């Protein structure tokens, strides 16, 4: 980067107006699943404008900016192409990618992380079934995962048989989900089965429809009866407290100060 700093510094000093100036150098390595480098890039930007990039076919830096900074991009490209040390390093870009990535490639790609699984009801779509389940699977690595559904232990087809690709979370883990449309019946058990290399055994998550209609009716009647009983009991206690206690009250001005004994 030192080789082209004078050019970028000159451009910065020649610009007017408020704000800062940023020179950005980006180098990337594209590797396949085995860790073999497939592509190498090296680009230079100024204030987010891409100026020049390494052209592997021409073995030189080529301008990428064709707007107001085109002249700068050409001058910068010509200047960098005269730097033999830089040119040699860029020609060996793919080889350097392999050298720099292999020491930690295994620790990053050979690791595994088991998935977290949860089954929940969701809004049905593209189906006449009244209920739809979603099996959420997240936080796993690598991306390959198998999701199947079972009803009372027997395999059933998901809502869509199309293969779904796991989506990256941005933290070296992935997420995906599977749907199942159904008409629930009392006593049925639906199970989402997730198989992944990070889990020693398949992960099972069950879902049941809940109470039967008769049970729901009985529970509702019992709840209403209990509520009415509590209301009646509360009203009785309030009425009793307001009425006070009935007892004998002697009249004032008794004519028999010593009392009267009747035998």
Swiss-Prot record:
Q: What family, per the record? A: Belongs to the MHC class II family.
Q: What is its main location?
A: membrane
> Altering residue 28 to A: what's the impact?
In allele DMB*01:07
Q: Is Transmembrane a UniProt keyword of this protein? A: yes
| Assembly, per entry | Heterodimer of an alpha chain (DMA) and a beta chain (DMB). Interacts with MHCII; this interaction mediates rapid selection of high-affinity peptides in a pH-dependent manner, with an optimum at pH 5.5.
Q: Gene3D superfamilies recorded for this chain?
A: Class II Histocompatibility Antigen, M Beta Chain, Chain B, domain 1 (3.10.320.10), Immunoglobulins (2.60.40.10)
Indicate the segments forming the Ig-like C1-type domain, all copies. Answer: 114-208
Q: Where in the cell is it found?
A: Late endosome membrane; Lysosome membrane
**Corresponding gene?**
HLA-DMB
The free-text domain remark for this protein reads: The YXXZ (Tyr-Xaa-Xaa-Zaa, where Zaa is a hydrophobic residue) motif mediates the targeting to the lysosomal compartments.
Q: Indicate which residues form the motif YXXZ motif.
A: 248-251
Which parts of the sequence are annotated with region: Beta-2?
Answer: 113-207
Effect seen on changing residue 248 to A: Abolishes targeting to endosomes and results in relocalization to the cell membrane
From the Swiss-Prot or TrEMBL record, give the protein name: HLA class II histocompatibility antigen, DM beta chain
Membrane spanning stretches: 219-239
GO molecular-function terms, A-Z? MHC class II protein complex binding; peptide antigen binding
The record lists the effect of residue 162 to V as: In allele DMB*01:04 and allele DMB*01:05
| Record annotation: effect of changing residue 26 to K | Decreases the interaction with MHCII and peptide exchange
Q: What is the effect of changing residue 128 to S?
A: Decreases the interaction with MHCII and peptide exchange
According to the entry, what is the taxonomic lineage of the organism? Eukaryota, Metazoa, Chordata, Craniata, Vertebrata
Ranges facing Cytoplasmic side: 240-263
Keywords assigned by UniProt, alphabetized: Adaptive immunity, Disulfide bond, Endosome, Glycoprotein, Immunity, Immunoglobulin domain, Lysosome, Membrane, MHC II, Signal, Transmembrane, Transmembrane helix
* Stretch list, region Beta-1: 19-112
Question: Which segments sit on the Lumenal face?
Answer: 19-218
């Amino acid at each position: 980067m030192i080789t082209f700093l004078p050019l970028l510094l000159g451009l910065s000093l020649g610009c007017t107006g408020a704000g800062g100036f940023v020179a950005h150098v980006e180098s990337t390595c594209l590797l396949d699943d085995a860790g073999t480098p497939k592509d190498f890039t090296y680009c230079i930007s100024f204030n987010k404008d891409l100026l020049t990039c390494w052209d592997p076919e021409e073995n030189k830096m080529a301008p990428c900016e064709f707007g107001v900074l085109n002249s700068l991009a050409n001058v910068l490209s010509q200047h960098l192409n005269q730097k033999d040390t830089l040119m040699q390093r860029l020609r060996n870009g793919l080889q350097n990618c392999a050298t720099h990535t292999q020491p930690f490639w295994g620790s990053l790609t050979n690791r595994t992380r088991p998935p977290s699984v949860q089954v929940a009801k969701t809004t049905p779509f593209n189906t006449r079934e009244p209920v739809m389940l979603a099996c959420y699977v997240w936080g796993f690595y690598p991306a390959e995962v198998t999701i199947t559904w079972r009803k009372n232990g027997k395999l059933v087809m998901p809502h869509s048989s199309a293969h779904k690709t796991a989506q990256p979370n941005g933290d070296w883990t992935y997420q995906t989900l599977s749907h199942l449309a159904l008409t629930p019946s009392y006593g049925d058990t639906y199970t989402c089965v997730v198989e992944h290399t990070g889990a020693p055994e398949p992960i099972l998550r069950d879902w049941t429809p809940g109470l039967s209609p008769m049970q729901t009716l009985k529970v509702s009647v019992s709840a209403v009866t209990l509520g009415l009983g509590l209301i009646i009991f509360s009203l009785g206690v309030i009425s009793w407290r307001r009425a006070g206690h009935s007892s004998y009250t002697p009249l004032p001005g008794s004519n028999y100060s010593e009392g009267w004994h009747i035998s």
